[in-house]
Regions:
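GST superfamily/GST-like fold recognition
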Residues: 166-170, 195
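Active-site metal-binding loops of divalent metal-dependent hydrolases
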Residues: 9, 166, 216-218
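Short glycine/proline- and acidic residue-enriched helix-loop micro-motifs
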Residues: 100-122
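Loop-to-helix element that buttresses phosphate recognition and phosphoryl-transfer chemistry
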Residues: 4, 9-64, 116-130
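Acidic, low-complexity terminal tails and accessory targeting/binding regions
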Residues: 81-93, 140-143, 148-159, 174-228
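Phosphate-coordination/substrate-recognition cap region in phosphate-metabolizing enzymes
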Residues: 35-104
Length: 228
């Protein structure tokens, strides 16, 4: 089984200098999305395209759906960690300062997420539980309780694309590789906009384990188009 993770294109975070919690893609972001869709045929036959419900993920998934002939399916669990509600419409400079202040807190406080937003603990649990449930619908289940990172995979030829976010995709990668979670997953697995990661299963004893084969691939972009 192969899981292909695509981060969304560059968003227009503050089109009028005021922040948006669920922004649309920028002009460059739309171009990045069209470029990654243009190379989807190189990934091999795709069975399903999944996407986060956020605008930037939907708008990145749309051309991939057109390229593959598949209708992207919304998975609510793939939503990025939720920003504080009060950030919506706030001056962008205030948001930048809030990020700086939040990152200066003690490490133990980082698990609480941004003040007023979703905690990292809740975010991690949401993504992992949603991922495990989505895989189960494909018949992919954990081998047993003693080996949580080994899986029963009935069809090694399955291939699924998930279009989501830096945080969501990082949690997915960390969990499938068996890495201990940290509240800085975004930095541990930092992917550029429309960066592609590919995880595939390989035989380990009587089960299958996920192996990270490609990460942060932006070969579909010109160098000046690469953004983080």
């Amino acid at each position: 089984m192969e899981l292909i993770l695509v981060r969304h294109g560059l968003p227009d975070w503050a089109p009028d200098s005021f922040a948006r919690n669920d922004p649309h893609l920028s002009e460059l972001g739309n171009l990045q999305a069209s470029r990654v869709a243009a190379v989807a045929d190189r990934w091999g036959p795709i069975d399903e395209v999944w996407m986060s419900p956020m605008h930037r993920a939907r708008e990145t998934a749309a051309p991939i759906g057109e390229s593959t002939g598949l209708a992207p399916v919304v998975h609510p669990w793939a939503y990025e960690i939720r920003n504080p509600d009060q950030w919506e419409g706030s001056p962008i400079e205030e948001i930048k300062n809030a990020w700086i202040d939040a990152n200066l807190r003690p490490i133990s406080d980082l698990w609480d997420g941004l003040p007023g937003g979703e905690t990292f603990r809740d975010f991690h649990q949401r993504v992992v539980e949603g991922l495990v449930g989505a895989l189960a619908e494909l018949g992919i289940t954990r081998l047993d309780d003693g080996h949580p990172h080994l899986w029963n995979v009935p069809d090694d030829d399955q291939r699924v694309v998930l279009v989501a976010h830096g945080g969501t995709n990082a949690v997915v990668i960390g969990h499938l590789l068996g890495a201990e979670p940290t509240p800085w997953e975004w930095d541990r697995f930092e992917s550029p906009h429309t960066g592609v990661a590919r995880l595939s299963t390989l035989a380990i004893a009587h089960g299958r384990a996920f192996s990270l084969r490609v990460f942060g691939d932006v070969s579909h972009l010109d160098p000046e188009m690469v953004t983080k």
